[in-house]
Each structure stands twice: as structure tokens, then as C-alpha cells.
Regions:
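Short glycine-enriched loops at secondary-structure junctions
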Residues: 47-49, 100-104
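Glycine-rich, proline-tolerant flexible connector loops at the mouths of alpha/beta enzymes
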Residues: 71-90, 147-151, 191
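Glycine-rich, aromatic-flanked loop segments that form ligand/cofactor-binding clefts
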Residues: 93-101
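Histidine-acidic metal/acid-base catalytic patches
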Residues: 2-42, 47-62, 140, 197-219, ...
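Catalytic domains of carbohydrate-active enzymes, especially glycoside hydrolases
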Residues: 57-74
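Active-site acidic/histidine proton-transfer and metal-coordination neighborhood
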Residues: 12-14, 33-35, 91, 111-216
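Conserved radical SAM core fold
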Residues: 104-109, 150, 188, 248-254
Length: 306
């Protein structure tokens, strides 16, 4: 997840058509404290932009029944802002989701963690070391890792071996602190051409190779639907290496119900698996403004009833 990608998400998307959610759009604002959701769906800054700044949005999310929060850019924020966010979440009994531990240089197609330059791997490990303090300030357990880009001059197998090796070294850094790095596979068809890790199954293979509780896979279902599809069987096959989940519908990368993914069935399967982790709402709102925020809440109420 890049800063530019998050900026796009938090800005909101232009409406591409009305989707009936079966819930009145004004219902979300009617109650000051709504019942808590049954799963830990995590909005992000911008999900409720009309309600104020980051702290105000956290308070509003809690009042609407959300029990978690996600902030990809938390590691880049001043320490005082990190501390304030952690305090706000603690006061609302909310769980902190992921932040990005090592941000790729998207426009440069770097780093090449499986390439020939050890300096790129050392830079990545330095980011991981710095992220330990961030995680402690935020009271976060999971941090997102993007395993970089492909080196088209090298065999994929060589790159896989090197990425397994560098992730083992990273695990040695975070495991003593009981932290988990979740590797995020990204789609190459729409958003991120050239990345190394392109599917949950590929992430599963790397995680198995690392063989550490500190290295798992982030199952972003928006990316997986574009790249591979077959979502529920993939989740089942890779379940023991999945450490975190993110939602987002396709096309459009907006809230559930705006695209082709049957999120009610996904939720049923997560319940059957007794999934108790955070589910990041890493997507935009299809409709701008307060009406779009109400639709967002209604969309999650609809799938949470599944």
C-alpha cells in the first residue's frame, strides 16, 4: 500500500451507480452508540472525513460499532500523533490494525528484495527495526510488508530464495517483540505491475519457507479477486499462513456491495473459521460526503448480518 494509493482511497471515489443496500442511509447517524459489529472491521482516516480529523473519526467509528482502526501511514506520522491515536483507540477499546513497515518506492520500482544488491535488503531490515518502536507506540501487533518488485534479469526461484532469507532475518528482529509482519500480495493487472508477490498462494509459499510466527500473509481480497479469483478455496488452502485480512470490492475498490465479490459468503466463512483478527477496510467510499459514509456503514451492517 503506497501513500498515493491511500490518498486516492481517502479522497473517496466518484459515484458509479447506486447499489441498494437494504438499509436507510440516514440510519447510521441516528444513534450515538450503535451495537458493536460481530467482526473487527477497521475503517481508516478518510472513511468518515465529514466527521472531523483523525481523532474525531475514530470516535465516530466507535460510536457506530466499529472495534478496530487501520492506518497505513502511521509510521510516517510524528510521534505525538502516533501517541494521540493510540490513546484515542485505547479509550474506545478499539484494536489497532496494520501500518506499513517499509514503504516501497513505487515510482522507482524499488526495492528489489530478491535482486543482487544487498544494500536494498539492508535498507528493508533497517525499516523493520525502526517499525518495532512504532508498533509499540501504537499498540499494534501487525505491520504490513510489501516484498518489493521483480528483477526481470533473474530467475523467479532465485528471488524467492532471497526473499525467504531476508524475511527470516526480519523475523529475528520482530519475533522477540511478539509482532507479526504480514506480507501483502498485490495485483499486477490494475494497480501494481512488476511487483514480486502477486497472490495469496505465493505469499503462502514464502511464509512456509520462512517458518516463523512473525511472518504471515495479508489476504487483501480486492487484489486477490483481480489477480486470481477463487477467493474462498484460496483462503481455505492458505489459512494457516494468513495473519490479516482486508476487504474492498471490485471493480472500483469501494465498500462491499458495490462490485462482484460476495462478501456475505466471505463473512460466513470467516465466522466458520472463528476468525478473531482485524479486517481492514482498505477501500474508498463509492459516494462522496456524509451520504457515502452512511452507505459505508450500511454496507458493513448488511454483510455482518450474514
Amino acid at each position: 500500500m503506497s501513500l498515493s494509493r491511500r490518498s486516492v482511497l481517502t479522497a473517496g471515489a466518484v459515484a458509479t451507480g447506486a447499489v441498494a443496500l437494504g438499509t436507510a442511509t440516514g440510519a447510521a447517524t441516528a444513534a450515538a452508540t450503535a451495537p458493536r459489529f460481530s467482526l473487527h472491521y477497521a475503517p481508516h482516516e478518510g472513511s468518515f472525513a465529514s466527521r472531523g480529523g483523525r481523532i474525531e473519526q475514530i470516535a465516530f467509528a466507535a460510536d457506530q460499532g466499529f472495534t478496530a482502526w487501520e492506518d497505513n501511514e502511521a509510521g510516517t506520522r510524528p510521534v505525538a500523533e502516533q501517541v494521540a491515536m493510540a490513546k484515542a483507540l485505547q479509550q474506545r477499546n478499539m484494536t489497532m490494525g496494520v501500518f506499513v513497515a517499509s514503504m516501497p518506492k513505487w515510482s522507482q520500482f524499488r526495492p528489489l528484495l530478491g535482486g543482487n544488491d544487498d544494500a536494498e535488503r539492508e535498507g528493508f531490515l533497517a525499516d523493520i527495526r525502526a517499525s518495532v518502536a512504532v508498533a509499540k507506540r501504537l499498540d499494534a501487533r501487525c505491520m504490513t510488508v510489501v516484498t518489493g518488485f521483480m528483477d526481470r534479469k533473474l530467475p523467479v526461484e532465485i528471488q524467492t530464495g532471497r526473499i525467504i532469507d531476508v524475511m527470516r532475518r526480519a523475523a529475528e528482529i520482530v519475533e522477540p517483540h511478539k509482532l507479526v509482519m504480514v506480507m501483502e500480495p498485490l495485483n499486477t493487472r490494475t494497480n501494481h505491475p512488476g511487483v514480486y508477490m502477486q497472490s495469496i498462494a505465493q505469499g503462502y509459499a514464502v511464509a512456509k519457507g520462512v517458518n516463523s510466527p512473525a511472518v504471515k500473509v495479508l489476504a487483501d481480497l480486492y487484489h486477490e479477486q483481480i489477480q486470481s479469483g477463487n477467493l474462498i478455496p484460496t483462503l481455505e488452502m492458505c489459512w494457516d499462513e494468513i495473519g490479516y485480512i482486508q476487504f474492498g470490492d471490485n471493480p472500483g475498490r469501494n465498500e462491499p456491495g458495490t462490485g462482484e465479490i460476495h462478501y456475505q459468503n466471505i463473512v460466513r466463512r470467516l465466522r466458520a473459521r472463528n476468525y478473531a483478527g482485524v479486517i481492514g477496510m482498505e477501500h474508498g467510499n463509492q459516494v462522496d460526503g456524509r451520504a457515502g459514509e452512511d452507505r459505508l456503514i450500511a454496507a458493513y451492517r448488511a454483510i455482518d448480518r450474514a
